[in-house]
């Protein structure tokens, strides 16, 4: 049967394990944004962490296309990690959930930034067609 303390530890281990995998998913997500910014030549000013935002990247504004690609790079990284993680279904699930949550077009999310950049790109294209 075991002592009550051992039962608590058995319950706590999967929670801590899942939380740790979630933090790793978040770190890799932000690395995806950072790598995309560097590849696209957008200067990164600061990378930090806040209790209400998790990790964040402060960078110069790029073109609407650069901003769209940088915003999409985070969820894309998590999707790639989901597909590349058959050795750990829990790690795959953490990455999948993180990708979906960030891809939703809710203000402040990557999905919201992607939608705004997409609108800017369409406006620019419409302006070029009229000219």
What do the PLM-derived regions correspond to, one by one?
Residues 1-131:
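Hydrophobic transmembrane alpha-helices and their immediate loop junctions
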């Amino acid at each position: 049967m075991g002592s009550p303390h051992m039962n608590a530890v058995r319950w706590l281990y999967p929670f801590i394990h899942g939380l740790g995998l979630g933090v790793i998913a978040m770190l890799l997500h932000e690395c995806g944004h950072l790598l995309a910014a560097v590849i696209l030549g957008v200067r990164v000013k600061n990378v930090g962490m806040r209790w209400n935002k998790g990790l964040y990247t402060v960078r110069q504004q790029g073109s609407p296309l650069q901003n769209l690609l940088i915003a999409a790079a985070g969820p894309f990284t998590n999707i790639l990690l989901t597909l590349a993680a058959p050795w750990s279904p829990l790690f795959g699930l953490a990455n999948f959930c993180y990708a979906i949550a960030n891809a939703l077009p809710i203000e402040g999310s990557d999905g919201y930034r992607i939608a705004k950049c997409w609108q800017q790109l369409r406006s620019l294209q419409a302006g070029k067609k009229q000219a």
